[in-house]
């Protein structure tokens, strides 16, 4: 039986000898992998194909790799559910950015479904990219042993993952197969095949190494880990025999070049590089039989004058090795430069447009000697300037030709001077000679008002350092948010698990094992589900939205922690609903007295009867001897009798700027942050300029968030900004031929009309 099996493998290898994997060329008949020895053919059942061999593990978990970043759990569920019942799907994502890492895990209920998916769906195109499927191996030691893993190089560019898999599947069960690709999806010419056993890997190396695949001779060998390759490479470097020589006189012949090195030992080969015309390129190579001879030649000839030129003689290096050494030298120089300016280089932003290098230096010169000061500017586009210049010259019709030429030359001179300084980017750098001076400048200049703008001054940091700090802060904030949400939902933190995709459910969080763990919200609620149409959302009946136990709401609509149909605080729907509460009757017998039947829809259960925010008493409790209900007609219940805050909903013991910063910390979306600032800024501007509050708010929102937060602390600065916005708007109205807003209102007759209506309103 063993002899028959060996003969079958030899026959497969012979068939591989003329295999062509190029789709364009006419390929011979495919290899018949279903052939089995006669001894096995007499059995009751035939053995399964290598790729469909049953996995020894009882788990039915598959690893799906090489995925496009835009692939979601829903796309994978639609594909893998065609094979059988899917238990769960999870696309692995970055903990901070939530971007896909390019791989996922698919769990089936039975191992048979997993084997079928591995057989039929491997290398299936998903979003234009073939996926790679293998059994999930949770033990990292088994994944990294390298047993059964082979390396193939010199592959043709037409060979992809599937073609490589089909070629090597004849020798045994393949766990994983991959052709290395660049960022554009092109083959790098090498790949890896991981067999289940070492015997299968040895058979593949024995029969395929040195054979032609797509008319290219391939190399197949055992995979050597990078650590072992590095140690072997260091050993080769220490025992080099090949020498590189440059700075050679162009008149030196091959014989003279060889004789120069022959005195140090036996030379196996020597060569001078020449161009197409046969002229020397000034460098060459010499290979010795022993390392000692090569080392002696390097020691004695390096820097020696030969035919009027100093030679460079050193160990011959490959291109990737030279690039690596060059990269290391650049990295060392960069780190040395960064360490040199550590603690003395300051970053300043929120600068005015009129601040140049000299003015920036003058601002910080009082704190100590400055080595350099630079304001970053945009580069000017010459094409736009030349076009403007031509337009101006075409308008001068009454001037003489000489005058036009003279003026044109003068303007060109001015334009050339202007091109040296582009528009300021609003930030710059100041480098001190002493770290103590830099620290003092940061302490005294940070948040100082200069030209109506608060400066931001801090120590300059490299981009990678800033990115790592930002990721760490975002991750810590997300973790704190998850803990707070878990505490509100009454779920222990140890039951918090990563989001997965369940069959028959929507994306959410895995239920806690052995309990009824309640998932926590993911940053939003179902807006107005109770008032929606029947069947608008899953599990909705009779126009009332609900989620059955242990199930998840639709993607993008997490469970509403404020109650069914409720709105979160600080939204227009929330404020409108609270206004309805103020209009309800108060007292023990009023509609808002005891039960939630008198509360309008959209109010969180925790806020029925009063606001449940920090700094306010619990909802529904009597305050200062008052009744249980909300006073009748009190629409502005948040400020009545409790000490109004500059921002509605802010605690009395917290400043407006601090409260706003706390709100902005809940989101990283710039558009959402602007919306939060606008909602809080509009009431303050409306008190100053009611008629144009909306326009002025929109104009001020173009400012930096840090500057806007300062406006909440300084009413005078806010008034100045409002007046500046009004002035800009008046200039715009003048250009449109309309009446400015700052003119008296009596001119159009509106104010007298309003005064005439006042007595009537009072009588009514």
Swiss-Prot record:
Alphabetical list of PROSITE patterns matching this protein: PABC, RRM
GO MF annotations in UniProt: mRNA 3'-UTR binding; poly(A) binding; poly(U) RNA binding
SMART domains, per the entry: PolyA (SM00517), RRM (SM00360), RRM_1 (SM00361)
InterPro entries attached to this UniProt entry: Nucleotide-bd_a/b_plait_sf, PABP-dom, PABP_1234, PABP_HYD_C, PABP_RRM1, RBD_domain_sf, RRM2_I_PABPs, RRM_dom
Keywords from the named record: Cytoplasm, mRNA processing, mRNA transport, Nucleus, Repeat, RNA-binding, Translation regulation, Transport
UniProt region (Disordered), positions on chain: 36-56, 375-420, 587-634, 735-764
Biased composition annotated in UniProt, kind: Low complexity: 597-613
Domain RRM residues, every copy: 60-138, 148-225, 241-318, 344-462
Extent of Polar residues compositional bias: 735-745
Annotated Basic and acidic residues bias: 387-399, 408-420, 752-764
Residue runs in coiled coils: none
GO biological process: mRNA processing; mRNA transport; regulation of translation
Subcellular location: Cytoplasm; Nucleus
Keyword hit for Nucleotidyltransferase: no
Chief location category: cytoplasm
Compositionally biased intervals (Gly residues): 587-596
GO terms for cellular component: cytoplasmic stress granule; cytosol; nucleus; ribonucleoprotein complex
Domain of life the protein comes from: Eukaryota
Segments forming domain PABC: 657-734
UniProt cross-references to PANTHER family, sorted A to Z: RNA BINDING PROTEIN
Sequence similarity: Belongs to the polyadenylate-binding protein type-1 family.
Purpose: Binds the poly(A) tail of mRNA. Appears to be an important mediator of the multiple roles of the poly(A) tail in mRNA biogenesis, stability and translation. In the nucleus, involved in both mRNA cleavage and polyadenylation. Is also required for efficient mRNA export to the cytoplasm. Acts in concert with a poly(A)-specific nuclease (PAN) to affect poly(A) tail shortening, which may occur concomitantly with either nucleocytoplasmic mRNA transport or translational initiation.
Protein name from the UniProt record: Polyadenylate-binding protein, cytoplasmic and nuclear
């Amino acid at each position: 039986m063993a002899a028959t099996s060996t003969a079958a493998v030899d026959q497969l290898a012979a068939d591989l000898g003329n295999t062509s994997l190029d789709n364009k060329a006419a390929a011979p008949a495919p290899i018949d992998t279903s052939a089995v020895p006669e001894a096995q053919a007499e059995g009751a059942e035939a053995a399964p194909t290598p790729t469909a061999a049953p996995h020894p593990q009882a788990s039915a978990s598959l690893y799906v790799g090489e995925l496009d970043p835009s692939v979601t759990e829903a796309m994978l569920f639609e594909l893998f559910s065609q094979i059988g019942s899917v238990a769960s799907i999870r696309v692995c994502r970055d903990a901070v950015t939530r971007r896909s890492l390019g791989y996922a895990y698919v769990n089936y209920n039975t191992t048979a479904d997993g084997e079928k998916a591995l057989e039929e769906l491997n290398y299936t195109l998903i979003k234009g990219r073939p996926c790679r499927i293998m059994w999930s191996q949770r033990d990292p030691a088994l994944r990294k042993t390298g047993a059964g893993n082979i390396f193939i190089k010199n592959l043709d560019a037409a060979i992809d993952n599937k073609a490589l898999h089909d070629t090597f599947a004849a020798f045994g069960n393949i766990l994983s197969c991959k052709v290395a690709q660049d960022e554009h999806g092109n083959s790098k010419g090498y790949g890896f095949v991981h067999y289940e056993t070492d015997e299968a890997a040895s058979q593949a190396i024995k029969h395929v190494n040195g054979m032609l695949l797509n008319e290219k001779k391939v190399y197949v060998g055992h995979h050597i880990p990078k650590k072992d390759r590095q140690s072997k490479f260091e050993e080769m470097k220490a025992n080099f025999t090949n020498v590189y020589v440059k700075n050679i006189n162009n008149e030196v012949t091959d014989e003279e070049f060889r004789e120069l090195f022959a005195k140090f030992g036996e030379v196996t080969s020597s060569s001078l590089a020449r161009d197409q015309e046969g002229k020397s390129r000034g460098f060459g190579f010499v290979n010795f039989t022993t390392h000692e001879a090569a080392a002696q030649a390097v020691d004695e000839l390096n820097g020696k004058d030969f035919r009027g030129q100093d030679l460079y003689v050193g160990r011959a290096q490959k291109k990737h090795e030279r690039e690596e050494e060059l990269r290391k030298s650049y990295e060392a120089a960069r780190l040395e430069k960064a360490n040199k300016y550590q603690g003395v280089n300051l970053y300043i932003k929120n600068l005015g447009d009129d601040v140049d290098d000299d003015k920036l230096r003058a601002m910080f010169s009082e704190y100590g000697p400055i080595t350099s000061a630079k304001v970053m500017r945009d580069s000017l586009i010459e094409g736009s300037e030349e076009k403007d210049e031509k337009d101006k010259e075409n308008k001068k019709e009454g001037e003489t030709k000489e005058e036009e030429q003279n003026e044109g030359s003068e303007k060109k001179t001015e334009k050339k001077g202007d091109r040296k300084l582009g528009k300021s980017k609003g930030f710059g750098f100041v480098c001190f000679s002493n770290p103590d001076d830099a620290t003092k400048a940061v302490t005294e200049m940070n948040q100082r008002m200069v030209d109506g703008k608060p400066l931001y001054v801090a120590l300059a940091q490299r981009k990678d350092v800033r990115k790592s700090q930002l990721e760490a802060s975002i991750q810590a904030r997300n973790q704190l948010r998850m803990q707070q949400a878990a505490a509100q939902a009454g779920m222990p933190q140890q039951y918090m698990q990563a989001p997965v995709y369940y069959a028959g459910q929507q994306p959410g969080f895995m239920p806690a094992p052995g309990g009824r763990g309640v998932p926590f919200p993911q940053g939003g609620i179902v807006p107005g589900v109770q008032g929606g149409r029947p069947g608008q959302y899953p599990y909705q009946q009779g126009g009332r939205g609900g989620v059955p136990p242990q199930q998840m709401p639709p993607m993008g609509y997490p469970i509403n922690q404020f109650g069914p149909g409720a709105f979160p605080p600080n939204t227009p729907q929330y404020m409108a609903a609270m206004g309805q509460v103020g209009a309800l009757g108060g007292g023990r017998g009023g509609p808002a007295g005891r039960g939630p039947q008198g509360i309008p829809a959209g109010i969180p259960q925790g806020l029925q009867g009063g606001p449940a925010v920090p700094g306010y008493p619990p909802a529904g409790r009597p305050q200062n001897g008052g009744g249980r209900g909300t006073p009748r007609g009190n629409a502005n219940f948040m400020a009545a009798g409790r000490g109004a805050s500059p921002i509605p909903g802010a605690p009395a013991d917290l400043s407006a700027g601090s409260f706003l910063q706390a709100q902005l910390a809940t989101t990283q979306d710039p558009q959402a942050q602007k919306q939060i600032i606008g909602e809080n800024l509009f009431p303050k501007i409306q008190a100053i300029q009611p008629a144009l509050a909306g326009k002025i708010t929109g104009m001020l929102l173009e400012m930096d968030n840090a500057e806007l937060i300062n406006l909440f602390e300084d009413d005078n600065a806010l008034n100045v900004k409002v007046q500046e916005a009004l002035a800009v708007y008046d200039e715009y109205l003048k250009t449109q031929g309309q009446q400015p807003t700052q003119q008296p209102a009596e001119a159009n007759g509106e104010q007298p009309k309003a005064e005439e209506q006042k007595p009537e309103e009072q009588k009514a």
